[in-house]
């Protein structure tokens, strides 16, 4: 019985830690963007991600039902915070302007990693940002 109670207590404590850390990441994104919006839930479910989010993505922000974020429960731990930070950034931009600036989100993620002393990941994400958004000419018809 004691082992069962200890296991339950540990599970509750870990669940609280996850929610707490998600809220800290949300507050970091709010502060960096200088935008206000209410906190939205994060659902960790790889099956829902593969069903709802864009193909090959690890997560996405959805605006329906007041907004929420889906993230795979199999996300590598070293990418969790920056992916969640990016999705919160998308939410904050969309909730305040109706638009999402993907280049801004990309740059914010690189800065977030650098500020948190994750320089190797920052270089990886910076290279990805450069390949996706830099030196591109946008032609509008």
Predicted segment positions?
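Classical Sec-dependent N-terminal signal peptides that target proteins to the secretory pathway
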Residues: 1-21
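Auxiliary, metal-adjacent structural segments of Zn-dependent hydrolase domains
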Residues: 22-71, 76-77
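Metalloprotease/metallohydrolase-associated module, dominated by Zn2+-dependent proteases
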Residues: 25, 29-32, 97-141
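Short alpha-helical catalytic segment bearing the HExxH-like zincin motif
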Residues: 78-87
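Catalytic Zn2+-binding segment of zinc metalloproteases
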Residues: 87-101
């Amino acid at each position: 019985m004691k082992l069962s109670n200890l296991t339950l207590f540990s599970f509750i404590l870990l669940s609280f830690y996850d929610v707490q850390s998600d809220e800290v990441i949300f507050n970091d994104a709010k502060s960096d963007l200088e935008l206000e919006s209410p906190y939205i839930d994060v659902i960790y479910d790889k099956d829902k991600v593969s069903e709802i989010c864009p193909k090959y993505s690890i997560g996405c922000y959805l605006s329906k039902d007041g907004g929420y974020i889906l993230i795979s429960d199999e996300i590598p731990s070293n990418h969790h915070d920056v992916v969640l930070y990016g999705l919160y950034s998308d939410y904050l931009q969309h909730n305040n302007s109706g638009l999402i600036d993907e280049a801004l989100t990309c740059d914010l993620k690189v800065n977030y990693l650098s500020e948190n002393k994750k320089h190797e990941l920052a270089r990886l994400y910076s290279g990805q940002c450069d390949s996706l958004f830099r030196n591109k000419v946008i032609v509008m018809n």
